[in-house]
Amino acid sequence: MINQYKAHDHQKFFPFESMGTCNEISCIGGKCSADKSKIACGISNLGRLDSCIVYSVGGNNQWEFELDILEKTNCEVHTFDCSGPAQRFVKPENDRLHFHHICLGATRSAGPLAEGKPCTREKELCGETWTMTDIQSHFSHKQIDLLKLDIEGWEWTIFDQDYAAAAALGLNLPMQLLMEVHYCVPGRRNPRLECRVQHNYTLETASDVVRFQSHLLKNGYVVVNRDDNPSCPHCTELTLLRVSC
């Protein structure tokens, strides 16, 4: 039984079976299951709000998701990505779309550019890294309605911080998460990014995936949709709602 979770396939994501249902599933940023699209829950409800906040983390200068959100809602969209030099990002013109050459992580760090060091490679984290609490405090965003993550291998670090302190500041966790989760496949000659991340929570074994799911559950998140990537046996797209606030 245990051996079945050692294979390089989607079975390792068994902890992320759906725990609830969503009455309205929408594909944002492209066709369903396309590489650049995400599966969201209740976008029409978000569209009825006069104002809302959406964070898009790790866009890699691809704006399909943001433009679709802007078209379907009245939300203010903030995109965060510190990989490579800032000038490589070309933000579409829209008063509700904002780009920040910042990454999100568990701790705050300056980054090579702030330290006066050269940084030109697109995969290198050139800008500053801020925590979610830093970001929300800086922009006075007490509530994030939707958080989209494309940060291969760094998913855990976003939630590895002191949320009790954040709550004391009146800051709330995002109400909905859209993220692709990756686990590391060791032993490759050129390991993918998720095997080269530098933190203590690399997802590699089925036990690691269980711990990550448990960590999300403790923060109130349940899976309402899972979409395994057919082109990537160690990747799955998750839609999670926060049901415990």
What are these regions (language model features)?
Residues 1-245:
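Phosphate/nucleotide-binding beta-alpha loop and adjacent structural elements of enzyme active sites
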